[in-house]
Structure formats: structure tokens, C-alpha cells
Amino acid sequence: MSRMDTNGKRLFIARHGETIFNLAGRIQGEHVHTPLTRTGFAQADEMGQALARHLATEEPALDLIASDTDRALQTLSVIAEHVGADWHQARSDARLREIDMGEWGGAWYRDLAGKLEIDHQEGLFATVAPGGETYRDIAVRLERWLGEQDFARDTVLISHGMTSRVLRGLLTRREPHPRFDTPIAEGLPQGSIVQICDGIETVIHLGGGEGEKA
């Protein structure tokens, strides 16, 4: 099996719900403890309902995987309840964390005006934070993670805005972004969930939140 395959199984990928950092306008990066807001829990609830409807005629045995951050694990717990999966059997991995924003992690976006360039059309950071990761760095850790997966069952995976876009880009075999030399999928509103099976992506639910911010 190629490391970019899902072995004929479905991989349901979502970003965590809105957090207190999202709401306040702070950069999370790889910060571990940034809990969901009420809106974030509602988004997780909607994603869980949508996935349950998508699987309504099936009773698949689902694997659960998430970043090891609170916001990802909280989101996964709500979705798991809707689809009858055991959250206690979930696996977490730090390689699924958000882009490391280095010295800017935890900063307020307003305080980085003139320093952090954002491509608002594509929803991507155009500046590498001091001590932070590039999109290529994210791809390298995700490729290593993918190389260890056998995808023996359908899987629900909760990650983060930028990281999930790179993961989706890798799994759908997109051409590298000309500016960042990395496969990066299109951004989706917070609260969205997609299905990827052997390179084909299908949007299961389109959320109503904002686009990706780390």
C-alpha cells in the first residue's frame, strides 16, 4: 500500500470546533490547552449528526484518531457519541498538531500587524514565524505518520486548520502549491467534515464557521 492510500477505507477528516483562542483572535499553533467554546461544541455536535446521517444505513467499526490537543480530543468525543464509537479507544498523536507558530504562538493577531502576512484569498500564512514551521515541515511529519498507518478500518480523524489542509492535500495527491512547495487542499469553514477514500474527497458537511486560522 502506498503511504498516500487509505487502503480502500474511508477517512473522515475534520478540524476541531471553535476555541476560546479562535473567538478572542489569538494564535493557537501547537498549544495543547485551548478548550472549545459553546459554539465549538455546537459545531462538533453538527459534525457528529452529519456523519451519523452519512452512515445511517451502516454500522461500520470506526477507528478514532486525533491530535493530542484538548480541542481535538473534545471535538472527537462529541462526534464519537453520535456515531456510537468508543472515545476511550481513540489514539492521539502529536504529529497531527497544528502548525508550530514558534515565538508567535499565543500572540494576538492584532499585535502581529505588519509582521505576520496572511494570504486572505487562500487562507494561508505567507510568513514563517520565528522558530516556527513551514508547510513543508507539516507535510514531512504527516508523511511519516501516514507511513505508519494501515487503515484497516474506516477512521474518524480530528486535526487542525492548516495541518488538515496539508493532510488532505497529500491524500488527494494535489500538486504542490507553487509558493509553498507543498500539497495544500482548499480551505473549508470551521465545522466542516470530509471523506477521503484512496485519493477522492467528498464533503460530508460544510460548516458555518470561519476559515482556517492556526
Where do the language-model regions lie?
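Acidic, low-complexity terminal tails and accessory targeting/binding regions
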Residues: 1-10, 53-54, 85, 97-110, ...
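Active-site-proximal alpha-helix that buttresses catalytic centers in soluble enzyme cores
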Residues: 9, 15-85, 133
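Generic beta-sheet signal
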Residues: 11, 62, 152-161
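Generic enzyme active-site microenvironment
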Residues: 14, 93, 158
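Short active-site segment of divalent metal-dependent hydrolases/proteases
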Residues: 19, 163-164
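Phosphate-handling substructures
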Residues: 21, 81-141
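Conserved histidine-centered catalytic loops in small-molecule metabolism enzymes
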Residues: 56-95, 117-118, 195-214
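Active-site signature of alpha/beta-hydrolase-fold catalytic machinery across serine-
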Residues: 78, 166-170
